[in-house]
């Protein structure tokens, strides 16, 4: 009969009949003999029971085995399937040996060790001949749906790039799950469940980067936490790292938060290679990058008009921030279209013009930063009505790229259909094939470096991950394995070395963090504001702020919520430029007469033709019409033919100028509209981004009415960031738009053109942010270590989250954000940011002190302690 083995701090032993107990300094774990070692109880050092109220348990482990000669055939087993389970005492814990697990598994040995601060979990698995271990989920443990007396303060957080706080996870039901994988979205290898008084901590202490995921999922009787490792191991597989579990406690003055779990994780993380040097100490990063730069992004439209970039730099940036280095991200430089790969060259508008722009900007303190699309290879792009494609690279890919592309489990090539390819598709090159590493360096990075680019991001290789590759002819194991982390590490190292041979100040980057590569990159793409959780949790920046600067990848001009969070979180100030910046009074609506044409392609300056929405391709067409127009020399013509879905051309009109802040003025949107034919009603639609207020429309007239002036009067609602104008046509149709105008309605009913100063709330906020980040607050905001922030009590405001694919979710966000920092010399500061355009009262509870503050609209305040 199995003995109950109790390990206390002194590792004393006791015997009983039904269970085994392992105790660490923060957590006691009980394993149930009758359930073949399932975790039946978890108790913190202060006596808080974390387990479910019932006797329910989860099997201690579950495994997936796959045939070595047929990757499509797998079997799954779990601890409860074992014919036998023997528990033995070891010097520092327990060893549980399982046999009789079916056709694929010979034996499993689980170890559970105590005595230190954490309980440590290890496992080895022996596969039978002809089988390989593919997935190992261990340990699995069931926690209570309710910590304490109420679930209302229960929270779950994992170390995900787009993580966040899930409140009351026990109420989410059995279909809820919250997991992330590394390489991939898991930026730090821990998960936590906590309430105000107690917390549970689960982590993988893996310094090598084995492929794994971890997190929680709903179950009938509780919440299951586990770690799942992915590999393809025949014979015996030994987990090469410890999984650890522990507990932590809070007090009424200092309640538990996810920061406590992150602090536990950081004790281990700072001992790893990726934390060898703080960012300021790194000699491989150029001095200007260590001088707290700001950042800006220019799109394809700007690059087609290089003088507009020069004008912005000279008239705005150099006048406002003459001493601040500037990272200049370029989007849309690719030859064929945005994110179309790998036929990048010549770039937009041409190599010579682009290189001169890069050189000129560098002389003014600007550093070029293109983001080529990683390992993706576009095989087809922009599907036409007749089924052909605007760009078809299948023949070249078959000859050059396909032998090195990712292969699915069934032996077929991996194919993806992202929306930006407009009905086309792409392959993914395998980073575990050395050819891919060399191809990326030789054919993508070096040509860009020779054009003068100092910085390059490996975009779309999220967290250093790409799809599982089962190619038998590639020099890596099937499926997943630590070879994936090794391969991307080699990519970053060789990329930096080859770029640096041409450009001594080379900086490399990749999309979304992975802690294993912190020390190999000089700036980090970050997207925590895109979390689907109602409450953001910037786990990566909290852990590694002093080691690597982050920027919010997709900034939204005028989005006060994002700006306030990013500023309080110590992220790089990232500007969204407008052509009116630095020009003095100008019209907010650009090119409403459709007279300014884009260079090198069909289109109008200031207007964007959308490829689609929510995965639906909008494949109608836009034309520059020189014949049919109301006035001037051109009008825009929109057509939707038979078999086509829709066409939309749109523009966001900035509403962050002070003229729009009163809410009392009346404005009129009007346009000359004409219809050739129309199968169903359509209109020029408009809405207010950042506000729940309704929008409106300018309906297209009947064909027999000819040109007709159509208008709508509006009041700008509070909180509105942009007026989005959408010329949208569904069904078979031909329509024209000309003379679109945005004017103010005066008291006598007449109108006058709106002129903005270019000195609105957004400009003021960004100026203050840049000044603090680069100047007075740099010791904290740019280089400081984040520490557990004060608890902030403030109001909330409605907010609509918008996600990739166009889905929306309404929620409430705080009116202010707060974080705390410690400088390299030990000075502490608290940063509080107002996320609204009106004054707000907030209360901070900081180290036993209560402090009430009144924040001015959009204020960023540093409280030096």
Predicted regions and their residues:
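Polysaccharide-binding surfaces and accessory modules of carbohydrate-active proteins
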Residues: 21-27, 46-98, 102, 114-115, ...
């Amino acid at each position: 009969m199995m003995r109950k083995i109790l390990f206390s701090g002194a590792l004393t032993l006791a015997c009983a009949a039904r269970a085994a107990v392992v105790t660490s300094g923060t957590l006691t774990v009980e394993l149930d003999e009758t359930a073949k070692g399932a975790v039946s109880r978890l108790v913190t050092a202060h006596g808080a029971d974390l387990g479910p109220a019932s006797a329910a348990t989860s099997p201690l482990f579950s495994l997936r085995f796959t045939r070595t000669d047929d990757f499509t055939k797998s079997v799954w087993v779990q601890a409860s399937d074992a014919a036998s389970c023997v528990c033995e005492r070891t010097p520092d814990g327990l060893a549980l040996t399982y046999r009789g697990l079916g056709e694929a598994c010979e034996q499993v040995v689980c170890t559970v060790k105590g005595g230190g601060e954490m309980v440590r979990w290890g496992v080895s698995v022996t596969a039978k001949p002809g089988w390989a271990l593919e997935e190992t989920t261990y340990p699995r443990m069931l926690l209570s749906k309710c910590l304490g007396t109420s679930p209302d303060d229960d929270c779950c957080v994992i170390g995900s790039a787009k993580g966040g706080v899930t409140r009351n996870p026990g109420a989410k039901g059995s279909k809820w799950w919250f997991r992330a994988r590394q390489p991939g979205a898991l930026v730090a290898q821990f998960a936590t469940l906590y309430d105000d008084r107690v917390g549970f901590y689960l982590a993988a202490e893996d310094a090598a980067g084995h492929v794994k995921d971890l997190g929680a999922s709903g179950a009938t009787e509780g919440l299951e936490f586990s770690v799942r490792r992915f590999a393809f191991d025949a014979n015996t597989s030994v987990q090469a790292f410890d999984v650890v579990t522990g507990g932590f406690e809070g007090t009424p003055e200092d309640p538990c938060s996810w920061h406590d779990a992150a602090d536990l994780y950081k004790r281990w993380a700072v001992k790893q290679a990726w934390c060898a040097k703080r960012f300021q100490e790194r000699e491989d990063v150029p001095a200007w990058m260590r001088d707290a730069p700001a950042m800006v992004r220019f799109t394809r439209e700007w690059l087609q008009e290089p003088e507009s970039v020069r004008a912005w730099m000279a008239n705005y940036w150099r006048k406002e921030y003459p001493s601040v280095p500037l990272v200049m991200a370029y989007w849309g430089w690719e030859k064929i279209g945005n994110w179309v790969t790998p036929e990048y060259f010549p770039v937009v508008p041409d190599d010579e013009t682009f290189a001169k722009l890069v050189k000129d900007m560098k002389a003014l303190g600007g550093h070029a930063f293109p983001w080529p699309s990683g390992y993706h290879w576009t095989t087809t792009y922009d599907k036409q009505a007749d089924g052909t494609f605007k760009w078809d690279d299948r023949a070249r890919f078959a000859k050059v790229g396909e032998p090195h592309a990712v292969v699915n489990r069934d032996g077929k090539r991996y194919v993806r259909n992202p929306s930006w390819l407009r009905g086309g598709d792409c392959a993914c090159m395998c980073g575990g094939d050395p050819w891919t590493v060399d191809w990326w360096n030789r054919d993508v990075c070096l040509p860009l470096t020779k054009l003068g680019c100092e910085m390059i991001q490996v975009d779309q290789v999220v967290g250093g991950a790409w799809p599982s590759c089962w190619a038998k002819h590639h020099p890596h194991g099937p499926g997943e394995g630590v070879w994936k982390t090794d391969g991307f590490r080699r990519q970053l190292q060789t990329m930096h070395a080859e770029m640096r041979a041409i450009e001594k100040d080379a900086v490399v980057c990749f999309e979304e963090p992975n802690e294993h590569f912190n020390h190999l990159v000089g700036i980090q793409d970050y997207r925590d504001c895109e979390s689907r959780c109602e409450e953001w949790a910037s786990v990566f920046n909290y852990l590694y702020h002093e080691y690597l600067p982050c920027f919010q990848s997709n900034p939204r001009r005028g989005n006060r919520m994002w700006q306030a969070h990013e500023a309080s979180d110590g992220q790089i100030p990232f500007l969204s430029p407008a052509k009116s910046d630095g020009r003095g009074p100008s019209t907010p609506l650009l090119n409403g007469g459709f007279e300014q044409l884009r260079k090198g392609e069909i289109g109008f300056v200031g207007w964007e033709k959308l490829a689609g929405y929510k995965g639906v391709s909008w494949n109608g067409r836009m034309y520059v019409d020189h014949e049919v127009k109301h006035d001037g020399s051109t009008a825009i013509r929109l057509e939707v033919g038979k078999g086509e879905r829709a066409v939309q051309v749109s523009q966001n009109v900035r509403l962050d100028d002070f003229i729009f802040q009163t809410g009392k003025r009346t404005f009129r949107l009007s346009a000359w509209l004409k219809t050739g034919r129309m199968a169903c009603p359509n209109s020029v639609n408009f809405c207010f981004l950042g506000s729940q207020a309704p929008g409106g429309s300018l309906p297209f007239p009947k064909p027999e009415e000819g040109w007709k002036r159509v208008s709508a009067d509006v009041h700008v609602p509070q909180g509105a960031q942009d007026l989005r104008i959408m010329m949208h046509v569904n069904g078979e149709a031909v329509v024209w738009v000309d003379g679109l105008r945005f004017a103010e309605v005066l008291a006598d009913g007449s109108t006058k053109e709106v002129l903005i100063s270019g000195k609105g709330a957004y400009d003021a906020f960004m100026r203050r942010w840049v000044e603090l980040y680069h100047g007075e607050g740099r010791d904290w905001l740019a280089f400081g270590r984040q520490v557990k922030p004060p608890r902030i009590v403030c109001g909330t405001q409605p907010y609509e989250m918008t996600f990739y694919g166009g889905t929306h979710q309404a929620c409430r966000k705080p009116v202010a954000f707060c974080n705390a920092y410690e400088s390299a010399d030990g000075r502490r500061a608290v940063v509080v940011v107002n996320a609204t355009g009106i004054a707000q009262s907030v209360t901070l509870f900081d180290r036993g002190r209560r402090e009430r503050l009144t924040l001015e609209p959009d204020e960023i305040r540093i409280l030096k302690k």
